[in-house]
Amino acid sequence: MPSSRLLSCLLSALLLAACGSDSAPEAAQPQADTPPVTSGSAVSDAAASDEADALRQRIAEAAEGAHRSDANKARNAARRPVETLQFFGLRPDMTVVEVWPGGGWYSEVLAPVLRDGGTLVAASYPMDGDVPFRAQMTRDYRARLAEHPEVYGAVKHVPFAPPTYGELGAPESADMVLLSRHFHNFISAGITDQVLQAAHAVLRPGGILAVVQHRAAADAVPEAEQRDGYVRESYVVEKAEQAGFVLGARSEINANPKDTRDHAMGVWALPPSLRACRSVEDEAERDACEETYRAIGESDRMTLRFTKPS
């Protein structure tokens, strides 16, 4: 009968479909490897990170270099040159003016980093200046650099002591001016404004004014700044802004909460000077005095990055 044949056909079709559904799925065909898509910003970020790491390594090698004394290298833990110079934005191709480099602690780090692609300008107190100990410090500094021409041979020198020697270099010729722990000296000499004006003049637009300074309490009286070596952060910011700079960033890299700032000899009571202990005649008492101040460590310091507007 036709209806019986139709029913048989339908049943056969259903059985074939069921068998087909139990068969193994077709194996996926292998595809060619496709490289991950990397955005331009990711590539740029990676390159910047690599560059920062390389610079950090370069500064660290300079800070631990054989040209430095063990005593100066021992102070790296307190003065943190790697972190500080990276915060300021140091690059190996910069022209950096270091104002009153003193014994050359920072010059020892900057010179190797800048030797090949940049320039270090040491703006020292003039050797014919009327402050004998500062003039002698410059002579000693120059002699020390002469001992390692392979490190310091490219360092340039300019005398700087306003108002007689009031320029740090040709206008807009530098990328960074470093003022490390000298604001109290500028205050004592009455040249703070002149120093900042000279820094502004020598910097290119966008250039950096890098400041590290012993930090006074916010409510400290100004008279104490000359005596104790500590300066109010608000004063430094005010003076820099008056000279035309813009505060870009603050850092607590060089902060020391153990420093109470109330030492009889001011900041010089602390390491490395330990001046408060020099007059102690008894050796055991002197050792105890020095141990007390060493436990505090070096001073609490502000670390400020200003820029000259473009």
Regions flagged by a language model, labelled:
Residues 19-23:
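Bacterial signal peptide processing site
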Residues 54-91:
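Class I SAM-dependent methyltransferase Rossmann-like catalytic core
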Residues 92-102:
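Conserved class I S-adenosyl-L-methionine
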Residues 94, 167-177:
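A short acidic, Gly/Pro-enriched loop at the edge of an enzyme's catalytic core
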Residues 111-112, 192-205:
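A short glycine-rich, Lys/Arg-flanked "PGG" loop and its adjoining helix->strand segment in the class I
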Residues 120-123, 206-214:
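Conserved beta-strand signature within the Rossmann-like core of class I S-adenosyl-L-methionine
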Residues 162-163, 185-198:
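A short, conserved alpha-helix within the catalytic core of class I
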Residues 286-310:
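C-terminal lobe and adjacent flexible extensions of AdoMet/dcAdoMet transferase-like proteins
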